[in-house]
Amino acid sequence: MPRSDNLYEIPNNVPVPVADGACNHLTGMRLPSVALRSTSGRLVDLAGLSGRVVIYCYPRTGRPDVDPPQGWNEIPGARGCTPQACAFRDHHQELQELGAQVFGLSAQDTDYQREAVARLHLPFELLSDSELELANRLRLPIFEIGGMRLIKRLTLIARGGQIEKVFYPVFPPDKNANVMSYLLCRPPDVLRRSRQRNDQYLKGNEWP
């Protein structure tokens, strides 16, 4: 039976999450070493990844045949996980060109996440923190509904296992312009050196 609303759209009247300071402690922290199961079938330890990593945390993706939990749309920041995933999908190539790996992370189990990856054609892996081990060690903001404990929506940018930027709260959920702008202003070293060489070349070959 199809759900009674459009999973792929964000209603106009959803409440806006407030900046409550719940993530103020994260910038500069080291990611803890936690083996997270991926939708690709492997274990991923975010702390051990080199380079820049974008980790977008989300409460839970819905399904087209199941209505959301009662009261879901009334929770600030809860609605919009599917549009958020699609936005990262649509900008994935650009993020890769900026030197970033992308992962989605939620408290849902891997089988549930795999359905979303297949249905939404996501080109990146989703990671399951079903025991909230990573969330608890980082003291990420959590909320409860229908017997579920879920991670609030936020985005972490890490480099070499250390958190360098936090976006929280994230609203609207499908707008990742802040992430793109941040990465564009801080290109990876290889792109930075290339730009510097281009600038030097142009200075040495100016029109008379």
PLM regions: where:
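Chalcogenol-based redox active-site neighborhoods
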Residues: 1-208
